[in-house]
């Protein structure tokens, strides 16, 4: 299922800050616009996935016309000037993203100390899982 949330992309000296107003100041950043968008997708997917895993409620997305970015950003930046920004919708299929990035198994071969191996064998630890 596709999840779509509005995000504020704020132009900073070092790139872009991305803030999801509906998700309690959830934010990320990127040096370029492309990187900021990739990070926004990853951030949104990770947040929604974690909420699902912890069975926490997720706030529904606002309609873009209901947002009040100047007020919201002023609250974040305080006395600093609000940077140039734009609003865009960020979408992600959390299930598909999780399968590819969060739930994917990776085979690794590693060396452990002999004492740790003996202890694991004593406790019946399955090294395959």
Question: Which residues does each PLM region occupy?
Answer:
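N-terminal segment of the canonical double-stranded RNA-binding domain
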Residues: 1-14, 19, 97-99
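Short, charged, surface-exposed hinge/linker loops at domain edges
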Residues: 2-4, 45-111, 115-122
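Surface loops and adjacent helix of pleckstrin homology
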Residues: 21, 31, 122
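Short, proline-centered helix/strand-breaking motifs
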Residues: 21-24, 113
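A short, exposed loop/beta-hairpin motif centered on an aromatic-Gly-Thr core
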Residues: 24-35, 109
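A short, charged, amphipathic alpha-helix used as a generic interaction element across diverse proteins
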Residues: 32-49
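A short beta-strand-loop micro-motif that forms or neighbors metal/cofactor-
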Residues: 122-129
């Amino acid at each position: 299922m596709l999840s779509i949330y509005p995000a504020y992309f704020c132009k900073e000296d070092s790139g872009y800050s991305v803030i999801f107003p509906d998700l309690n100041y959830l934010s990320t950043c990127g040096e370029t616009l492309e990187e900021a968008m990739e990070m926004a997708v990853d951030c949104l997917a990770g947040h929604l996935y974690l909420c699902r895993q912890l069975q926490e409620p997720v706030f529904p997305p606002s309609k873009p016309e209901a947002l009040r970015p100047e007020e919201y950003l002023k609250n974040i930046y305080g006395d600093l000037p609000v940077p140039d920004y734009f609003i865009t919708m960020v979408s992600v299929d959390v299930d598909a993203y999780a399968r590819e990035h969060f739930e994917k198994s990776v085979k690794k071969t590693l060396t452990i100390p002999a004492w740790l191996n003996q202890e694991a064998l004593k406790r019946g630890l399955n090294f395959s899982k």
